[in-house]
Each structure stands twice: as C-alpha cells, then as structure tokens.
C-alpha cells in the first residue's frame, strides 16, 4: 500500500513538473511583443469595450504604455473606475522605476458607461462620443459574454448573440463616421477559435426554438468574423481597416458561467495554469492589430498569435455575410 501511495505521489509530482515545464519552456506561442516605442500611439484615441478586466484590461494597459488616449467602454462604471485607478497606479509605478524616473509618455485613460446588452445604452454612448470626441483612431470590439444560461437582452435578443454581435454591430456602425474622419483608422474585432462549431441559422437567430449555450457562443463568434469581412468590403477605399482575431485560450473571468465540479477544480486550475494564456499574453494580437505598422492597410483578415491564419469556408461565405448584415441592420433599428 505504501509503495502504491508513493508511486501515485511521484506520478502526480512528475505530472505537475511536466506541466510546469510545458508552461515555461515548451513551444509557447509568441508570448509577448512588448518593447515597442513608448510613443507609438501618441496622439491616438482608442476605444476598448469591456476594458475593465481580462483581455480588455491588458490591452488597455499596453496601449496606454504606448502613449494612446484610451477610452474604456464598460457596463459597470464603478468596476471600470476601480480598474482605471489600478491601471493608473501600476503605470505610474512602472514609469517611476523606468530608465528615466518621473518621465512618462503614458497616455490618458477615460471611463465611459456602455452596456452592449442595451441598444439604448449603445446609442447614448455613441451620441456622447460624437459630441465629445473629435477623433477615434482605433475601435477594439473586445467585450463578450461566454456560455451563459438562456437569457435575453433589454431588446429581447438572446444574450450572447445580442452582446457579442448585435451590440458591437450597432456600436461600430454609429461610430463609422468618426472613424472615417479620423482615417487612417482601425477596427479590431475579438472573435474565438470556437467559431468553427457555430452556424448561422437565420430561422432562429434568437435561439427560441432550442438553446445550447456552447453552440450559441460559437454562433456569435462566427457572426463576428462574417461581420468583419463584410465591413471590410464596405470600407474599401476609405482608409479605415477592420480585422478579426482569436486570442487563444486565456485565463479570464469570461468562463464564470461554466460549472466545474468541486473535485475537478484543482486539476482544472493546474491545467489552466500550465496551458492557458495569461490575459497579457492573450491580448498581444489585439495590441498588434491596433498599433503595429506591419498591418497598416491590411483589412478583412483573421489573425491569431500576431499572424494571419486561414478561415473555414463557412466564415468566408459572402452571401451569408451580406444576409447577416442586412438582418442585423433591421434587428438593431438601423433600417426599418
């Protein structure tokens, strides 16, 4: 019995060490692209949805470091103000410890309330943006909801499709004029590898006939890609580019609706620590598409780990993309 117990302990320890090795010395994706010119984004205004936590917060932190003026569009203003305060303190401390203490090119950080589950909130937010912001250089559609129980938005849409696709669809369309007048400008859309498991069912976009939270998330992420490709077509010649990305598997609170049995949680935590990206790692492609001169003029492409990737045929179906666009215009009230 003692031998068996010792063997089990050694096996567990060996497994943990192997996972740790994979975490730190394995073939990890290009982990960080830091070290860019701190003034690269100086004078540029960037709007990031869902910037108070996870990928959005990490994206905001790096773009601030690069000198951007960052607007955090967040549903919970109190949490966003708290996150903004933490970011300011962290960046101030980093500047004080830098090669020239007290000298910082860190950009400005602004918090604005935006609830993508409410078209009324989206319209109010955009009206405020158009009244108060003279320019918008980068829009990052980052916010999202993941595999939640069935619920509806304020306007009666299935929550994942409503927030992940329709809310951002309206937001982007209402800000297009400002983006065009600020050109060259960029739109960055955060999708997911899980788009592969989704389909666009035009007969039940609201998932009222049946609801599978995993499938509906994948559908919304496929919609993000189709939206990006159709928008890129419509923006040809405007000097406004739009690209879409997947961040990989990232340790964020996006999966808060997923139930993990108590006995499995320790193993899940170990696996996520070993194999999942940190938010900073996951944000690198968003940062790259928002700031890098390498993608100047590039539009309608799909990226992962800061490089272009191929899409499945269903994500490149132009007729489906146009039909989705037309229906989305009606759903959000851009067309009657």
From Swiss-Prot:
One of its GO terms (cellular component) is endoplasmic reticulum membrane. The active site is at residue 217. Its EC number is 1.1.1.300. GO terms for biological process: osteoblast differentiation. PANTHER family: PHOSPHATIDYLINOSITOL-GLYCAN BIOSYNTHESIS CLASS F PROTEIN-RELATED (PTHR43157), RETINOL DEHYDROGENASE 14 (PTHR43157:SF72). Retinol dehydrogenase with a clear preference for NADP. Displays high activity towards 9-cis, 11-cis and all-trans-retinol. Shows a very weak activity towards 13-cis-retinol. Has no activity towards steroid. This is Retinol dehydrogenase 14. It comes from Homo sapiens (Human). The lineage of its organism: Eukaryota, Metazoa, Chordata, Craniata, Vertebrata.
């Amino acid at each position: 019995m003692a031998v068996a117990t010792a063997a089990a302990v050694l096996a567990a320890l060996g497994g943990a060490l192997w996972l740790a090795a994979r975490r730190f010395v394995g073939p990890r994706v290009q982990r960080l692209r830091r070290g860019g010119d701190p003034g690269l984004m100086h004078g540029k205004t960037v709007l990031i949805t869902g910037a108070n936590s996870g990928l959005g917060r990490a994206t905001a932190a790096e773009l601030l470091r690069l000198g951007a003026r960052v607007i955090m569009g967040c549903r919970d203003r109190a949490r966003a103000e708290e996150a903004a305060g933490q970011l300011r303190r962290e960046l101030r401390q980093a500047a004080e410890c830098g090669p020239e203490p007290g000298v910082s090119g860190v950009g400005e950080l602004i918090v604005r309330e935006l609830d993508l589950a409410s078209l009324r909130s989206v319209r109010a937010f955009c009206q405020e943006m158009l009244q108060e912001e003279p320019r918008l250089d980068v829009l990052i559609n980052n916010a999202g909801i993941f595999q939640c129980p069935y619920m509806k938005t304020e306007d009666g849409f299935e929550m994942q499709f409503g927030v992940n696709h329709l809310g951002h669809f309206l937001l982007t369309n209402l800000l297009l004029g400002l983006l065009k007048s600020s050109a060259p400008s960029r739109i960055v859309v955060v999708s997911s590898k899980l788009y592969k498991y989704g389909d666009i069912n035009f007969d039940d976009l609201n998932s009222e006939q049946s609801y599978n939270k995993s499938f509906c998330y994948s559908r919304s992420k496929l919609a993000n890609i189709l939206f990006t490709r159709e928008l890129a077509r419509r923006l040809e010649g405007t000097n406004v580019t739009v690209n879409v990305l997947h961040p990989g598997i990232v340790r964020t609170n996006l999966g808060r609706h997923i139930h993990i049995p108590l006995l499995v949680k320790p193993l899940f935590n170990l696996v996520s620590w070993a194999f999942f990206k940190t938010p900073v790692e996951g944000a690198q492609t968003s940062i790259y598409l928002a700031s890098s001169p390498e993608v100047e003029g590039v539009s309608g492409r799909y990226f992962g780990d800061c490089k272009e990737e191929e899409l499945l045929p269903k994500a490149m179906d132009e007729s489906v993309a146009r039909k989705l666009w037309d229906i989305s215009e009606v759903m959000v009230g851009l067309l009657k």
